[in-house]
């Protein structure tokens, strides 16, 4: 954003309520996960992506992970667009939460629920839901919860089928 004086950040990598006649509204639903407010936020997300991403990719395949990232970006973008008309969202935290939950399915065997999944749900999603219930939650917590729920949906769905999707 510095080279373009913030234009790319605002117009490409940040989703917010804008007119449906603005053609940039549609790519923003996906591209907002590539924008970050600062380098520290980028670093914290990329480190987690680099740790859990390969596990999830090894188990479920690159095509499925790319689909999961795109759908998570779309869902979190739409949540903002519909429910937070005065808000703006950028960052990959929803995708990070989705991958954390999805990676916990990596060792899942048929008919079992991995202990790591239970712990991830209690620690990560439980904290986000607690913040939502106590009223201290905002858009960030909602995107984390959405990412975690999507990670569970993808994990349970793909763990039932055969491995692949590469």
Locations of regions flagged by a protein language model:
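A detector for small-residue-rich transmembrane helices and their helix-helix packing motifs
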Residues: 1-166
């Amino acid at each position: 954003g510095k080279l373009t004086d913030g234009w790319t950040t605002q117009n490409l990598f940040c989703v917010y309520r804008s007119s449906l006649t603005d053609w940039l509204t549609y790519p923003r639903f996906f591209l907002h996960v590539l924008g970050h407010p600062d380098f520290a936020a980028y670093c914290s997300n990329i480190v987690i992506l680099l740790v859990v991403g390969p596990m999830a990719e090894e188990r479920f395949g690159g095509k499925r992970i790319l689909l999961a990232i795109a759908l998570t970006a779309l869902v979190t973008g739409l949540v903002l667009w519909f429910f937070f008309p005065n808000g703006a969202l950028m960052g990959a935290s929803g995708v990070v939460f989705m991958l954390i939950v999805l990676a916990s399915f990596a060792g899942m065997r048929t008919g079992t629920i991995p202990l790591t999944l239970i712990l991830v749900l209690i620690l990560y999603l439980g904290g986000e839901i607690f913040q939502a219930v106590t009223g201290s939650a905002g858009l960030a917590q909602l995107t984390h919860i959405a990412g975690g729920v999507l990670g569970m949906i993808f994990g349970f769905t793909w763990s039932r089928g055969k491995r692949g999707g590469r």
